[in-house]
């Protein structure tokens, strides 16, 4: 909220208010408007106010028609003065000048109190200025003025006036003020309503994200104009992150002719009036751009990888089966061969040249010779282990040997 304090000199405040009529409409070629001087729609008894009717008319033809509470009055001048206002002057005022349409109504209220909160108007459109004045009876000075909205203070002023240069929806509420004269006074509440000019924009894309490279993408900054103003033109700006894509264009669309991976990011838009009195930003919209993809359909890729997986599983099972069969066959062939060779190996003995017996065990793979415990060992080729030396001959044989 932008607040500006003023002193007793009201020229700046008056200049601020005259460009916007009381009814909240900009001067146009079809509708008349009413302005007030001084610019307050609430005044004390015995105070003066002048209403001015402005609108299109032919040169030299400024004939004006005034309406009070719906009844035409016999006044044909562009100005309507109320000297020393009374309660009977309270009511609804309209005017029509030249070829214009009747103006929007202005509600004038006459009060009798010690302290009065004056407003430039009670109903206005966001972006328009609002002037407030804490006014003492018979223009008595008021010090240490505090302004309140909905019961909460929002401005302390050393003088009695304050202005909100650009109103928004949060400025709607019940306003009052308090100040010190001979005593501490508090004004009655005044209802101020700020109407929305256009809705908060929403950024939408023509295609769903993510989308492939090369896609044509149109971004649309959508908003609804709630109040029609003659000559009103909205301006649209587009951004990605902090980068400006397009600034203050009258078109609500932005085109990405051929999307690339670099175009991915968070996009948002901004809508503003021509004088930037109302400016609103949309939420962010994330755009994701996919890299190059095969032209084959998705179901083809699923079927392909499923087939590869099945073939791999079958090959693994077959390999394990074949390997197991080979091992079983080899085992069945080796067992009989080893058994037969073992029997033959145990059925013969061999006598060495030195008279020592040795037994040879032969198998299909190797033989191991065995030597008698007390005699020398001899290796015979690949024979099996040597057997112990046979027992000596009987006693009779030994006797014959000793005799000889």
UniProtKB/Swiss-Prot annotation:
Membrane-topology annotation of the record: Single-pass type I membrane protein
GO biological process: antibody-dependent cellular cytotoxicity; antigen processing and presentation of exogenous antigen; antigen processing and presentation of exogenous peptide antigen via MHC class I; cell surface receptor signaling pathway; defense response to bacterium; innate immune response; phagocytosis, engulfment; phagocytosis, recognition
Signal peptide from the UniProt entry: 1-24
GO MF annotation terms: high-affinity IgG receptor activity; IgG binding; IgG receptor activity
Superkingdom per UniProt: Eukaryota
Keywords noted in UniProt: Cell membrane, Disulfide bond, Glycoprotein, IgG-binding protein, Immunity, Immunoglobulin domain, Innate immunity, Membrane, Phosphoprotein, Receptor, Repeat, Signal, Transmembrane, Transmembrane helix
Disruption phenotype: According to PubMed:11911823, mice display altered endocytosis of monomeric IgG and impaired antibody-dependent killing of cells by macrophage. Antigen presentation is also affected and those mice develop only reduced inflammatory responses. An increased in IgG responses is also detected associated with an increased number of antibody-forming cells. PubMed:11911824, also reported that a variety of IgG2a-immune complex-dependent immune functions like protection against bacterial infection were impaired.
Expressed in which tissues: Macrophage-specific.
Family indicated by similarity: Belongs to the immunoglobulin superfamily. FCGR1 family.
PANTHER family: HIGH AFFINITY IMMUNOGLOBULIN GAMMA FC RECEPTOR I-RELATED, IMMUNOGLOBULIN FC RECEPTOR
Protein's UniProt name: High affinity immunoglobulin gamma Fc receptor I
Organismal lineage: Eukaryota, Metazoa, Chordata, Craniata, Vertebrata
